[in-house]
From Swiss-Prot:
Induction: By ammonium. This is NADP-specific glutamate dehydrogenase. Keywords: Chloroplast, NADP, Oxidoreductase, Plastid. It is found in: Plastid, Chloroplast. GO terms for cellular component: chloroplast; cytosol. It comes from the Eukaryota. Belongs to the Glu/Leu/Phe/Val dehydrogenases family. Residues 26-50 are annotated as: Disordered. Disulfide bonds: none annotated. It comes from Chlorella sorokiniana.
Amino acid sequence: CRPPSSPSLSWPPGLRSPALPRAVACARGRSAKRDVAAKRLRSRSPRMDATTGDFTALQKAVKQMATKAGTEGLVHGIKNPELRQLLTEIFMKDPEQQEFMQAVREVAVSLQPVFEKRPELLPIFKQIVEPERVITFRVSWLDDAGNLQVNRGFRVQYSSAIGPYKGGLRFHPSVNLSIMKFLAFEQIFKNSLTTLPMGGGKGGSDFDPKGKSDAEVMRFCQSFMTELQRHISYVQDVPAGDIGVGAREIGYLFGQYKRITKNYTGVLTGKGQEYGGSEIRPEATGYGAVLFVENVLKDKGESLKGKRCLVSGAGNVAQYCAELLLEKGAIVLSLSDSQGYVYEPNGFTREQLQAVQDMKKKNNSARISEYKSDTAVYVGDRRKPWELDCQVDIAFPCATQNEIDEHDAELLIKHGCQYVVEGANMPSTNEAIHKYNKAGIIYCPGKAANAGGVAVSGLEMTQNRMSLNWTREEVRDKLERIMKDIYDSAMGPSREYNVDLAAGANIAGFTKVADAVKAQGAV
C-alpha cells in the first residue's frame, strides 16, 4: 500500500458541486465564452446608467442565461414534468446556491417513484423545500488586541412538522447561506429517520475558531448567542455542535443563554456532563456510522473484522469512527485534514489512535502532520486518502461536503472498495454517487449513516426534560437500537420501490415528514 507519485485530480475551487458547474460559472462570468455572451446581452439590454448605477436589466438577462444552462443539468433524468418545473423554479430563485441545489436534486431524483404512486405528495415536497424561517444576523466582537471584528451568523429553521427544529451550529470560514440551507434540508430527513420527534434546522457563522484564543472564542460565542437566544428554546429550536463547535463553544454558548434568559433548560445539546450533557455524545456520529454499516454487513453474512478501511478527517467523527472500527476488529489505514493525510501501512493500533486523540484534545487546531510514528507516512499538498494505492474494503468520508468527487470515486473503485459510508454531511458529489452505483458499491448516505450524532442529541433532550442521566451502557444500547431502526427504515422502501439504500433512506425520511405536513394542513 503506497501513496501515488502524482497528485490526484480534483474539481477546481468553486466547482465542488459538479451537478451545476456550468450554471454557477455562467452566473459568475468565469469563462471567456460567457464574457462574450454577457457582452451580447448588454448590447441587447439597456446600458448601465452612470448616474443611478442601474444594473437591473443586465443582471436579469445574465440570470436568465445562467438559469437556462443550469436547469439542463438540474432536471436531467427527471421525467415528471411537474417535478422538473418545481426544480427549475427553486433554482431560479437562488442560482448561486449550488450546495443547496445539489442536495435538493439528490432527494428529488430518489423520490420520483413515490410521486408516481402518491402524486398528492408532490405539492407537499414543494412546501418542504422552502424553509419555514431563515435568520441572518451580525456578530460583532473584540479580539485580544481590542480590535472590532464582525462576522455573519445564520440559523435556518427548516421544518418543525415532526418536532422542534434540531441541528448543529457550524463555525467555519466556508459557512454561507447555501451551505446552511443544504445542511438544514438534509437534517429534516436525517432526524425523521431516527424515529425521535425532531424537526430540521442548522446554523452557524463564518467565524474561524482556529488560531483564536479561548478569550476570543468566548467573546464571539457570547455575542453570537446574544442574538440567537431570541429564536431558540428547548421546545422550539435546540441547536448542537458541528464543525468548529465543540464542548468549549457549547459551554460558552450555554452560559450566555442562561445569563440572558435566566433559564436553566436543555436549549443546547452536546453539553458537558457536569451541566446536563449525555454520555457518548462526542462519540455518537462516528460510532453511528460504524454501527450502520455493521447492520448492512450482517444482512450479507459478513462482519467488520479484517475489513481494510480508509477514514478521512481527524475531528470527533473520524476519531470515534476509527475507535469503534478498531474495537470491531477492522483495519484503519488513514486519517486526514484539509492539508493532507497520514496512513499506517499495517493499520493504526489503539495506542497510535490514542496519540492522535490526545494531540487533538490538547490542541484542537493541531494538524494531522504533527502525528508522529515510526511507521506512518504523511502526504501533504492538500491530497486526500482516496488516492492510496492499496486494497480498500470500506471508505468512511468523515471530513466535509463534496470531498469525494468523480475522480476520487474512480480511484476507490479501482482499489476494490465495496462500501462507502458517509460520516460527514454530503461528502460525495452526485457524479461520485453515480460512479458508486454503476460499479455496484453499496452507498450508505450521510442522512442515515451519520444520524447517530443527532440521535444521541435527541436522547440528551429526553434526559434533560426528565431531569436524569443515563449510564454510558444505557445510551450506547439505545444508540445501537436506533441505528438498527434507521437501517430497517431505509431498507423497507428500498425493497418496496426496488431502489438503492440511499433512495430508500430519502423515501422513508420524506414520507414521514410529508404525512405530518399533510395532517397539519397547508400553512
